């Protein structure tokens, strides 16, 4: 090894392929919302046909945003994603405000909420006292941070594994719901007046589709961002659209719209119990926990890159430490530690 190679500063490693990028898109979007959102959309729409239409329109809107992101990603294939795009288009002030919001508000709030929800489901499933909630939440965040600290390739493996595992209960619920369910799907009223307008139902679906844009934050670590990013975003959104619509149809085959609205967040668990017996609810609980791990991993992986990019530009306190890349793992470990620490607080 020459002196030039020894003294060369560490750089982020391009280890993310198409499968890992797809897993980031699907894993960050397909969280607990797949189980929780259908009743909320149904309540807002007031009718099964309009509820399904809301999911379709939400998919179209998300795809429009995804195609826009692809154009920007090909134009600016760098680490930082939307932060970089805002900087290039609107200037450093707008980008700074966006990055500051993600670093100190959105990122910690989202990661902390996901960890808290994981610990709640974990304690409920295994009968653990509630005073262990903070410990379990910290443990799952520490686990995700550790995997991300080992390397982006390992974080990608975890994302693929979590995405595959979370699809198992969703696929089982969808397949057996369509197979064994005998309910009607279209033109069924909830039996109560719609709780909001159709536009609110569409907005509710957009929250379920949210998260796909974060994959652009790791564009600088993709092997070929010009090809991988567009394929991951478009392919991921098409897959997610199919999953959401199929899971809604499956639920309608098992539960009536009025039952879905009345059961609320428990609708998927009750549907699983009808299909698989007493252990059906546990299946959904495990699916939710795996979904949360995938979401946590995706957010720590992508948001830490925004922190890193801001620190490179000396826009954060302690930028010298936050912009450091570990020589062995080629990852911004300190940026991830900051996110997890703020999330726990």
Q: Which stretches of residues belong to each language-model region?
A:
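Juxtamembrane helix-boundary/capping and inter-helix hinge elements in multi-pass membrane proteins
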Residues: 43-48, 75-79, 88-94, 220-228, ...
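TM-loop-TM module centered on a large, flexible mid-protein loop between adjacent transmembrane helices
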Residues: 84-85, 91, 123-124, 128, ...
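Select transmembrane alpha-helical segments in multipass membrane proteins
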Residues: 15-25, 60, 91-104, 136-140, ...
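Generic alpha-helical transmembrane segments of integral inner-membrane proteins
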Residues: 56, 60-64, 104, 108, ...
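Transmembrane helix-loop junctions in multi-pass membrane proteins
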Residues: 34-40, 115, 147-153, 279-280, ...
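Membrane-interface "cap" regions at the ends of multi-pass membrane proteins
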Residues: 1-49, 62-67, 79
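Helix-loop-helix junctions that connect adjacent transmembrane segments
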Residues: 7-12, 52, 128-132, 160-285
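Hydrophobic transmembrane alpha-helices that form the core helical bundles
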Residues: 40, 53, 63-141, 145-149, ...
């Amino acid at each position: 090894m020459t002196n030039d190679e020894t003294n060369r500063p560490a750089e982020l490693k391009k280890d993310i392929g198409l499968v890992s990028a797809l897993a980031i898109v699907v894993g960050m979007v397909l969280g607990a919302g797949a189980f929780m959102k259908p009743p909320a959309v149904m309540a807002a729409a007031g009718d099964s046909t309009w509820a399904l239409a809301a999911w379709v329109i939400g998919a179209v809107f998300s795809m429009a945003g995804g195609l826009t992101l692809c154009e920007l990603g090909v134009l600016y294939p760098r680490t930082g994603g939307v932060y970089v795009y805002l900087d290039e288009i609107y200037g450093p002030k707008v980008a700074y405000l966006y990055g500051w919001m993600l670093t100190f508000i959105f990122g910690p709030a989202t990661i902390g909420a996901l960890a808290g929800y994981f610990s709640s489901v974990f304690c409920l499933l295994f009968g653990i006292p509630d005073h262990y909630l903070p410990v379990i939440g910290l443990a799952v965040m520490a686990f995700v941070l550790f995997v991300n600290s080992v390397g982006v390739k390992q974080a990608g493996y975890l994302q693929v594994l979590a995405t595959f595992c979370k699809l198992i209960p969703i696929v089982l619920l969808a397949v057996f719901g369509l197979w064994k369910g005998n309910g009607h799907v279209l033109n069924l009223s909830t039996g109560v007046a719609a709780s909001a307008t159709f536009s609110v139902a569409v907005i509710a679906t957009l929250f379920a589709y949210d998260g796909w844009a974060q994959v652009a934050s790791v564009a600088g670590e993709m092997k070929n961002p010009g090809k991988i990013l567009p394929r991951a975003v478009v392919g991921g959104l098409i897959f997610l659209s199919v999953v959401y619509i199929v899971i809604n149809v499956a639920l309608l085959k098992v539960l009536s719209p009025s039952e879905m609205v009345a059961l609320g967040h428990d609708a998927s668990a009750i549907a699983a119990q009808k299909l698989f017996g007493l252990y059906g609810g546990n299946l959904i609980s495990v699916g939710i926990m795996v979904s949360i791990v995938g979401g946590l991993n995706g957010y720590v992986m992508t948001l830490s890159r925004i922190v890193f990019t801001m620190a490179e530009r000396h826009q954060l306190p302690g930028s010298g430490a936050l912009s450091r890349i570990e020589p062995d793992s080629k990852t911004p470990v300190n940026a991830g530690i900051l996110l997890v620490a703020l999330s726990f607080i």
